[in-house]
């Protein structure tokens, strides 16, 4: 009897263990599916580019206007060039305007927490009025929005760092060029002052200057002849010059063709 009861207990435990294993497997599968769904639903930020920014339009304005469509993250506006800023400041100072000069921006980038909202905003608000109210100062300005596909904020940071580095290198090159021009001018002035001082020097009564000129052909031949083994070459060169001059003189006297033509004539006759 005891053996039969033990066999029954063993047979009852086996299906229980099988059901527990199946439940564990189902729970693990559900957890993996939830993790996969969570990874699919992960929010990816998107960036919208602003190609036109009206005067006196600030990041706070764009944040307030676009926050109605979705959560806005980081906002960056590119300031106008320093040269343009100086010209505007000078014009404002010359015109005697009551309002002081305010810095303006040329372009901007807005980050949305969800790229789907960024796409929707760029597609729906493009070429529409910025201000909805009649008294809004930006009512007659239009949105110029473009969604940047696969563009992240790190790309923008790298791009801005690259532009900053290029600007610094250009500034260094301009400063170096200006320094070279200034040094050359100062050297020229000092040289002229030395010349003027030397003109009134009593050690030079004539006040004449001597300048080194390039050696002539005769001087070069004389130098070559002075070298070991150069006399023979000089003699050969002079002999060749004399022969050429004699041939040219005979050709002028007798009306004969030059040596090159006289050599080509018989060859043509033979060929014919």
Swiss-Prot record:
GO terms for biological process: endonucleolytic cleavage in 5'-ETS of tricistronic rRNA transcript (SSU-rRNA, 5.8S rRNA, LSU-rRNA); endonucleolytic cleavage in ITS1 to separate SSU-rRNA from 5.8S rRNA and LSU-rRNA from tricistronic rRNA transcript (SSU-rRNA, 5.8S rRNA, LSU-rRNA); endonucleolytic cleavage to generate mature 5'-end of SSU-rRNA from (SSU-rRNA, 5.8S rRNA, LSU-rRNA); regulation of transcription by RNA polymerase II; small-subunit processome assembly; spinal cord motor neuron differentiation; transcription by RNA polymerase II. The modification N-acetylmethionine is found at residue 1. The keyword Transcription applies. Gene3D superfamilies: 3.30.70.330. Keywords: Acetylation, Coiled coil, DNA-binding, Nucleus, RNA-binding, Transcription, Transcription regulation. Residues 46-142 form the RRM domain. Residues 1-11 have a biased composition (Basic and acidic residues). One of its GO terms (molecular function) is transcription coactivator activity. The keyword Coiled coil applies. Residues 23-34 have a biased composition (Acidic residues). Residues 1-38, 198-272 are annotated as: Disordered. Residues 161-191 form a coiled coil. InterPro entries: ABT1/Esf2, ABT1/ESF2_RRM, Nucleotide-bd_a/b_plait_sf, RBD_domain_sf. GO terms for cellular component: nucleolus; nucleus; transcription regulator complex. Its main location: nucleus. It is found in: Nucleus; Nucleus, Nucleolus. It comes from the Eukaryota. Interacts with ESF1/ABTAP. Interacts with IGHMBP2. Could be a novel TATA-binding protein (TBP) which can function as a basal transcription activator. Can act as a regulator of basal transcription for class II genes. Belongs to the ESF2/ABP1 family. This is Activator of basal transcription 1.
